Each structure stands twice: as C-alpha cells, then as structure tokens.
Amino acid sequence: LTLREALELANGTLVWESLSPTEQALVAELSPAVDSGQGSDIGFALPEGQTTIALTALLPEILVPGLTLDGTTQAGYDPNLMLDPRFPAPPVVTLTVAPGYEVARGLTIAASDVTVRGFTMHGFRTAHRATQTTPPTNIFISAQAPAVDSEPNLPPLAVFRLTEPEAAPRNVVIEQNWLGLTAEETLPDQPSAFGVVVFNGVDTVIRHNRMEFHDGSAVITGHRAEGLHIHENAIIGNGLAGMPDAIRLEGQIAASEITGNLICANDGSGVFLFKPDGSTQIRDNQIQFNGRRFQRSAVYLMGSDHQVTNNTIGYQPGAGITVAAYPASHRNLLRSNQFAQLDGLSIDLIAQGNTGVRDFQTGDGPNPPRNSRHRRLDTGNGSVNAPEFETYRFAATNGTALVTGTADPGTELDLYHVLELGLPYGALGEYLGTVQADEAGQFAATLELPVGSRVSALATDPAHGTSEPAAVAILTAADGSFPTLPPPAPSLPDCSPPSPLPPPVFEERPPEPLVLELSRNIHFGLDRSEISPESAAILDNIAATMLEYPFLTVELHGHTDPRASAAYNMALSERRALAARDYLLRQGVAPERMRIVPFGLTQRRSQDSSRLAYARDRRVEFIFTDLRGLEIIFIDQEADLQLE
C-alpha cells in the first residue's frame, strides 16, 4: 500500500474489498483495539534504501479519530540513538516533496487522538502569489483545513466551525520527529515554511521533536490552541526567511505550556506571544543564541497572567524578557530565571503605551519610577517599580553584607548575583534568594558573597507582576575598596545534540593570536543576491576555517551601492547576507555562530560613482570574533568583483 491509500483506507474513503489480494494481506483488523476506542495504526515496511516518500499532491486529511502513523516501525530505526529526549533518534522514513512539485502540507490532521511519530519531514512550502496561501507547513492541525488557495467557490467561514470548541481536534500528539532538516542533518534545498501549525486544536502535545531550518517558525498557533503542550523539543535555526520567532503563539492559548525545550539560534525571539487570548507557562527552557537576524527579545509577552520561570535565557541581541504596554499586559510573573550576555535589560516593561517598532521587538530600556496612577494602565505589568538600593556600595564584613533598599510595599524581592561587568545594569546571573518588602516598602537581605561581587534585584507584586531589575550594587571592603572580579569565561555558541563520546581533553596553554589569510568579503552583481562561482570558492574557504576553529563567530554585514531607495537597498542587503549565511549553513557551519546585520546603502566603501566603486559597494562583509578575546588578522579581496 502507498501512504495515500493507507490514509484513505483509515478514513473509510477506500474500501478493503477494492484492494488486490496482495494489498489485502497488508491490512489486519484490530478488533480488540476498536472495541476499546482506539483507531487504526499505520506502520511502515519500505524496502531498504527506498524509505523516502516524495509527494506530488496533498495527502488526504486525517479524518478518523485515534489514528497512529508510526514511522518507528520501519526496519532500521534504532531508539537507542536517542541520548536526550530533545534530540530523538534519526527517523528512517522521510516525507518530502517530489522535485518540480509544490505541496503545501505534509500531514493535515482534522481528527482527535491522532499520533504522528518517527518521521523526517521537509520541503512543504508554496510560492508567493498575489493572494497568499494558507500556512504551508509540515503538519497542519484544524477541524477542517481551509483550502490552500483562495477560490471563488470556497465554502463560507462557518463550515470550518471555528466558533465551536467541541469540533476542534483534541489530544493530537506529534513526537519523535525530525521536522525541517534532512535525514543527513542538513539544510534542505527546499526548506519547509513552518514546522507545526496548530490552527484549531485543543490539548495538542508537541514533544521530543527536533525542529530545524524552517523558513518561518517551528511552531505557530492560529485561532485556537488551548492546552497546547510544547515539551522537550530541540528548536534550532528556524525563521531563516520568514516569521523569525521559534515559537509564536496567537489566538486562544489558555492553559498552554512551553517546558523543557532547547530554543537556540533562531532568527528572532525564542518565544513571541502576539495578542493572545489566555495565558501560558514558559518554564525550564534553555533559550539562547537567538536573534540571529532580528534584534528581538528572547521572550516577548503580550497579554496577562503569563508565567516565565526557571529558564536559562542568554546571548541575545536584545532584552531577556519584554512585556508589552499595548495590548494591556499585566500580572506576568517572571521569576527564578537566569540571564547572560544580553544587549538590553533582563526584564523590560514597555512604558507609557509605547507602540513603536522597537517596542514590539526588544524593549525601551529602564523606566523611571512610577509618577502617576496612569502608569498602572499604560505600562507593562502595571509599572511595578524596580527596587532601589539604599546605596550602590555595601560594605562586606567576614564574607557577609547587609543589603537594604526600597520597593513597592508588600512586594517580594528576588535577589541576584550579577556575574558580568558593566554598569548600571547587568544580566541577572545567579538567583540568591527572596525577601519581603514591609508596609513602608523597606527591604533588607544578608548576602554571603566575596568582596567585589555585584548584585541586583527584581520586585514581584502578585496584583501587577514582576518589575524591571534594580541598578547594580557592589559589595566592598570596609574601606570602600573592591577588586574587579573576572567575568565568566566566554561560552562557545553551541546548540548541538549530546555526543556519546567523552569530550576531548585539551592541553591548557595561553592561546596564541590567529593569523589567517582569510578573505572577509564577497561581492554581488547589480541588483542580485545570488552567490557567484568565484564567491562560492571564497565561502568554501570561510566555512572550512570556521569548522576548524570552533571559537570563531561571525556577523554577516550586507551592503549595496547607493542606487535605488534606502528601503529597497536595505531589503537587498539582507537578501545578500541571507544568501551567504544559507551557503555556510549547507557547508555545516552551525546557525548559532552566525548573525545577519543588513546595512543597505549606509556604509559604502567610498564616495566614488564609478562602475568599479559600485561593484566594491555590492558586498557582504564577514566580521569575525574570536571568543577567546584575541585579535584576528584578515584580508580583503576583490577576485569576485562583478562590474555591471
């Protein structure tokens, strides 16, 4: 049987009697299971070396409850290769699109209690049209999936039963799949647009999946996703050319949870909540090295009553957690999280109804103390005041220091050890404990930390939420002096799965400066973003160097010549940087080691207007950083200049 025939047979649109005797032998009736309410099982016994199912058209919607599609039944699947639940064993069965065809969705689920397990899926996308299609994705969940394209004879909206919660598929489970990447763990030639779209589903479970290299988000919700559980997935390197956020929640999301995931190296936020109805819990996740293409907060919250707790959040070109001012966002509890290496506050509450572009991406910086009751209405989390220390230098005696200050009366103060250098704010590194502010707003805490340590605090008011952090205070010796403690050792960008081999032991010796004869730029044709053969050779050399030296990271700066508008050139420079990044991805360079920065026409090589000067302007520059803090010597090249 083909997969299409198996789905039709399960749905009842293909009858058993119409099958050939050979095909009938592949179908067995599970009477006890049917009596217990369980539906059909679809297993796989594909010939060795022929385990890729390439579609030329949409598969039938899954309409029968209780169906299980189990790719782990295919010979060759080894569950022992799963060393971490977030990195499932490599599936053997691949579901993709045949070359030269466009298929919008891999699987469309319109029934309850459906399980999809053990597949590799990629290639599901649609070309841009005058009227855009409904979301193309690996897996689409809805009571009745809308048509891919808009047509004059489409049924009315009521047919989709969006206003009937009981019609939504319930308890759909997506587990142990590789979504977006190939079986060889590489970027596909044709990436999928999205990973999983929960358009209209209740109590959906997405767990133990590896989700990488989608043009858009790995998980996105639509009209209804109440009770959604996203648990222990590896969500890496998504948003390459579209919606940049790893997880984007919209619509009805009450009682949803995002727990235990590795959310790493995505192009935007790790989690972005856009005008949701209901609240979610985000806890116990590693959210790091995101914002590869956009300067966004690691977690961006709209709405009220969300809880963000016990997460590790860091290495973000923006704030750690941002709470919007509009729509009204209150009572969001943001506690026991650990932050590192942020280009912004650990927690940023958008103030005074600010709705600029930056306010919906990364935050607006520290807020002044609340000066009016109106701030309760127009600022995130009711404008809970950040704590203020009585002084910003506290003397430590015998290894302890009494830290005092003020906050909103009755709030709970979470104190943090700030491990990084810099004033007046720093990432909240190590949680130290909690104290209570009295009715006058006074608080005190005894801390056991060495002289030179830096501390900060957050205030949480259950009626309004958690505040922004306090400015940093330093623990000093009795005479007011303090040493400058060394910052934490740099962390190499790493989103890779665990290795079964022990880590190599290196001889400890002072690193020597690198002297590399490595080109740091490539050039493009007029109004083009394709990689030329000459530029490809240069990129091959860059990729080989980055694979050899894992402590190198790179920013890809896109540039254009000055012709055309600033907006057009900004988009063109981004396309050029993306083309270079995608080429390096296909050569095996990890996405967490690269970041896109488009400059448009703002940084020309010279002010000349000759053909040669314009050719030099049309470039991507590679700005390398040695995470050991050493200088690197690079060279420019012009071997791939393209004169118009």
Put a short name on every predicted segment:
Residues 480-553, 625-644:
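Periplasmic peptidoglycan-binding/tethering modules of Gram-negative envelope proteins
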Residues 559-632:
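Periplasmic OmpA-like peptidoglycan-binding domain that tethers envelope proteins to the cell wall
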Residues 103-105, 125-132, 183-194, 215-221, ...:
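Short glycine/acidic-rich loop motifs that flank beta-strands on beta-rich extracellular proteins
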